[in-house]
Amino acid sequence: MAAVEKRRQAVPPPAGFTDSGRQSVSRAAGAAESEEDFLRQVGVTEMLRAALLKVLEARPEEPIAFLAHYFENMGLRSPVNGGAGEPPGQLLLQQQRLGRALWHLRLAHHSQRAAFNNNVSVAYECLSAGGRRKRPGLDGRTYSELLRRICRDGQAPEEVVAPLLRKVQCRDHEAVPLSVFRAGTLTCFVLLEFVARAGALFQLLEDSAAAVADRRVGQAVLDTLEGALQASDAAAPARFLEAGSRLGPDSLALALDRAVGGRRPSAPMTREEFLERAAALFIAKVKPVG
């Protein structure tokens, strides 16, 4: 037994469990913990988590480009309560808030309801934040400017969107609740998509050489579109797109066949007129604010 004990004592400890090894492992673990603490303290962990959630919500076709754009726009964040980081000039601060709100609103398509509604809330909070010379809350002036920016950036003709803006805008000093903000922004985005679809439809009707369509044909399509919209009892703007999408090829073919059946000469219809009249059908279904 004494010989066995001596042999056991003579066995050297494993190399990984020497005192210096234990110290290096301890230092590495401490460094890892301190790095994690640092990332957590400066907000990087939460920032990355939020960015990944945005990717899951929006499900973009190019996630890397989406993340690059996301982090680029993180620099536009303005202080909520003013302070040393507040840029000089109230106008500059307002433009930054508008830009950031627009960016949030475009992160997800309006058909992704949960993600879009969440982004609407974030945009509303961004515009409602107080500052040195601004009381918390969103006024009609800022809200109306945002709607104009949405329509302008969507490249819709001004004469097409102007009637809608008159319906959904608020007075400059009027307080705008979240429900009105959501309805107005959603309606603008849906109108832009509606006009884009109408433009694609006009391309099928137009004479490419003259860039105009036969008036009888254009009127037949507008009448069919109006019938589809009137048949929809839903008041939600997104449902108007569904109604327009239900224009089956049979109904359109019948309308076009009737239109070209006459032999009387017809005046041309321009793209601008077609889009304006198509948008008017949409806007007629929108309820005015208040």
Curated annotation (Swiss-Prot):
CDD domains recorded: DD_TPGS1
Compartments it resides in: Cytoplasm, Cytoskeleton, Cilium axoneme; Cytoplasm, Cytoskeleton, Flagellum axoneme; Cytoplasm, Cytoskeleton, Cilium basal body; Cytoplasm, Cytoskeleton, Flagellum basal body
InterPro entries linked to this entry: DD_TPGS1, TPGS1
TM segment ranges: none
Residues modified as Phosphoserine: 34, 266
Alphabetical keyword list: Cell projection, Cilium, Cytoplasm, Cytoskeleton, Developmental protein, Differentiation, Flagellum, Microtubule, Phosphoprotein, Spermatogenesis
GO cellular component terms listed in the entry, alphabetical order: axon; centriolar satellite; centrosome; cytoplasm; dendrite; microtubule; microtubule organizing center; motile cilium
GO biological process terms held by the UniProt record: adult behavior; chemical synaptic transmission; sperm axoneme assembly; vesicle localization
Gene Ontology terms for molecular function: microtubule binding; tubulin-glutamic acid ligase activity
Positions of the UniProt region annotated as Disordered: 1-30
Role summary: Subunit of the tubulin polyglutamylase complex (TPGC). The complex mediates cilia and flagella polyglutamylation which is essential for their biogenesis and motility. May act in the targeting of the tubulin polyglutamylase complex. Required for the development of the spermatid flagellum.
Quaternary state and interactors: Part of the neuronal tubulin polyglutamylase complex which contains TPGS1, TPGS2, TTLL1, LRRC49 and NICN1. Interacts with PCM1, CSTPP1 and LRRC49.
Protein name (record): Tubulin polyglutamylase complex subunit 1
Primary gene name: TPGS1
